[in-house]
């Protein structure tokens, strides 16, 4: 059963509805040389609705907010030109030292890393192949082995290189899947299900001389995941920059073996005739990613979890007294977004509003609040949810926003219980 694909489809449908209702500001802006100390508020100028993010690190909601130190690093980098290749090399070497891996590359997000890492596996022994993928593949190995339960929407980034997936479900099938066309074995770290675990996946692939790629995009915290998988033997691992690490949204990390990271860089910008030319990473994103790694490594898993639980408990405390309402705090039992979430349940015969309707009410209100899209879903995102569960993602809330979320939830639910 491919639970994740259905979950992702539900999320993508939610994203499409969100975008459809957003509208776009039209018209050219007049030039204005005036500068305010913090810059002009272009959200206000463009008529874009600001939101309170009680959902999580979703791309459609602009992911995370960069900490002050990261914002400052990005702003400072924007003021001075440098040689891009020198910056990428220096940043990669620095990040690799900090994350205990052979090499690293700052990419244009985790999806970009999937494409570049795959291209690296396809072209490392044949540099002319850089110019041939994804169409001229007669002499290029292009089969990627994956567990059937690990197929997901984001593997399109791998198919961008002209690959063909070979799906397996058992160890016997996995052993038999390798041939002269096999170029990579792919593992989706947050997949629900799959008969073959990480260590066995790596062991078998390496026995056949094939590199392993682990997509762990949303899988920090815990902090140690940033080196756990490379130390486990995965040749390539990717993390999103704009999720738990709190870097720029359009940045990511590709970590792994020196040979493969070097090959990934050859398939990347600023080289023109490559599959990664459009995946440009600017100096601001590179510096921001380095600064985010520095910031993230000053945190602790225990400290972050305690803060997130505190926010959830504060919201739950302000919902007491609503008939039949019960609140619990839960962590997903999958690797992605493994942080405390607040789950709210009630008797729909007593509180006469559906979780989806609550989500819409908070979205339409002022300030506009986005709840986690697994609200009203069965086992959403690895959480113990059902059709009658409101899910509040507390980890992207900013100071004081938990009280606003609690107030709006209480207003909507109390009115429905009247």
Stretch-by-stretch model annotation:
Residues 1-7:
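N-terminal secretory signal peptides
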Residues 12-15, 21, 36-52, 56-61, ...:
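Conserved PLP-enzyme active-site core in the AAT-like
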Residues 26-35:
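Bacterial Sec-dependent signal peptides at the C-terminal "C-region" and cleavage site
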Residues 50-60, 71-77, 339-343:
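Generic N-terminal amphipathic, Lys/Arg-enriched alpha-helix
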Residues 60, 73-78, 102-108, 145, ...:
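Short glycine-rich or small-residue beta-strand-to-loop segments that form or flank ligand, phosphate
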Residues 67-109, 120:
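Conserved N-terminal alpha-helix of the aminotransferase class I/II PLP-enzyme fold
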Residues 298-331:
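Conserved PLP-dependent catalytic core of the aminotransferase class-I/II
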Residues 320-413:
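Conserved C-terminal alpha-helix-loop-beta "cap" of PLP-dependent enzymes
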């Amino acid at each position: 059963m491919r639970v994740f694909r259905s979950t992702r489809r539900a999320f993508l449908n939610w994203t499409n509805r969100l975008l459809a209702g957003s509208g776009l500001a039209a018209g050219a802006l007049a030039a204005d040389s005036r500068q305010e100390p913090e810059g002009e508020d272009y959200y206000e100028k463009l008529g874009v609705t600001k939101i309170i993010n009680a959902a999580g690190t979703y791309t459609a909601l602009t992911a995370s907010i960069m900490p002050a130190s990261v914002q400052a690093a990005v702003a400072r980098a924007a003021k001075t030109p440098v040689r891009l290749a020198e910056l990428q090399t220096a940043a990669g070497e620095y990040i690799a030292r900090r994350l205990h891996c052979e090499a690293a590359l700052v990419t244009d997000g985790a999806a970009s890393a999937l494409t570049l890492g795959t291209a690296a596996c396809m072209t490392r022994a044949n540099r002319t192949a850089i110019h041939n993928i994804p169409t001229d593949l007669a002499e290029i190995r292009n089969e990627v082995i994956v567990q059937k339960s690990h197929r997901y929407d984001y593997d399109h980034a791998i198919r961008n290189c002209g690959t063909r997936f070979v799906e397996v479900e058992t160890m016997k099938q996995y052993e038999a899947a390798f041939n002269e066309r096999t170029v990579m074995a792919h593992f989706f770290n947050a997949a629900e299900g799959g008969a073959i675990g990480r260590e066995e996946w790596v062991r078998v692939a390496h026995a056949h001389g094939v590199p392993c790629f682990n997509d762990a995009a949303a899988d920090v915290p815990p902090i140690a995941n940033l080196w756990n998988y490379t130390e486990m033997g995965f040749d390539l691992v990717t993390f999103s920059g704009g999720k738990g690490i709190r870097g720029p949204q359009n940045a990511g990390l590709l970590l792994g073996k020196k040979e493969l990271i070097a090959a990934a860089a050859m398939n990347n910008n600023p080289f023109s005739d490559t599959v990664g030319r459009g995946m440009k990473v600017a100096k601001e994103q590179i510096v921001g990613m380095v600064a985010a790694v520095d910031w993230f490594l000053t945190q602790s898993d225990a400290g972050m979890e305690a803060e997130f639980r505190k926010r959830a408990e504060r919201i739950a405390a302000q919902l007491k007294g609503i008939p039949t309402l019960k609140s619990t705090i839960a962590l997903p039992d999958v690797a992605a977004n493994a942080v405390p979430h607040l789950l709210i349940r009630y008797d729909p015969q007593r509180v006469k509003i559906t979780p989806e309707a609550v989500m819409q009410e908070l979205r339409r209100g002022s300030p506009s609040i986005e709840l986690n899209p697994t609200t009203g879903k069965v086992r959403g995102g690895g959480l113990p949810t059902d059709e009658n569960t409101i899910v509040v993602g507390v980890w992207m809330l900013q100071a004081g926003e938990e009280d606003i979320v609690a107030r709006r939830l209480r207003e909507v639910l109390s009115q429905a219980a009247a």
